[in-house]
A protein has these predicted regions:
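C-terminal motif of bacterial Sec signal peptides marking the signal peptidase cleavage site
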Residues: 13-16
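Bacterial signal peptide processing site
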Residues: 18-21
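Post-signal peptide N-terminal segment of mature Sec-exported envelope proteins
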Residues: 26-43
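Surface-exposed binding patches on compact interaction domains or structured appendages
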Residues: 38, 43-93
Length: 132
């Protein structure tokens, strides 16, 4: 009888658990030209954290600085800046500097909640005339 009771309680706990649905970004692939620009990644749920997963560029991305406060989370390096405004946590601002190299730049941005994540790949095309 005791085992049956424990099994029933365990099953009830499983059925009453809240399962988080995954956060979803509006766009998962964004291709932009070489000019300096800002991109807004919109999400359907509140974003708790941002990160960049990887980058492929002529500039080393391992020198990224991460800092934050109660109002913003910021990640930046030589050619990009990610900003999550905690007062409006449904979007991430991605600021890209002009791509003066002869290679495309690729940046994967990850947004997350407690346990779920979503990613967007941003490709900044190379400068068609790198001598400019």
């Amino acid at each position: 009888m005791k085992r049956y009771f424990l099994f029933t309680v365990f099953c009830f706990m499983l059925t009453s658990c809240y399962v988080e649905s995954p956060i979803t970004l509006e766009k998962h692939f964004i291709e932009v030209d070489y000019n300096a620009q800002e991109i807004i990644l919109n999400a359907d749920e509140e974003i708790l954290n941002i990160n960049y997963v990887n980058t492929e560029s002529d500039i080393d991305s391992d020198n990224a600085k991460k800092y934050g406060s109660q109002t913003a989370q910021i990640i930046e390096n030589d050619w990009f800046k990610l900003i999550l405004n905690r007062n409006s946590p449904y979007c991430v601002c991605v600021s890209l500097k002009e791509n003066l190299s002869d290679k495309d730049r690729k940046l994967t941005v990850s947004v997350s909640r407690t346990i779920r994540k979503d990613k967007a790949l941003i490709v900044q095309k190379k400068n068609p005339d790198p001598l400019k």
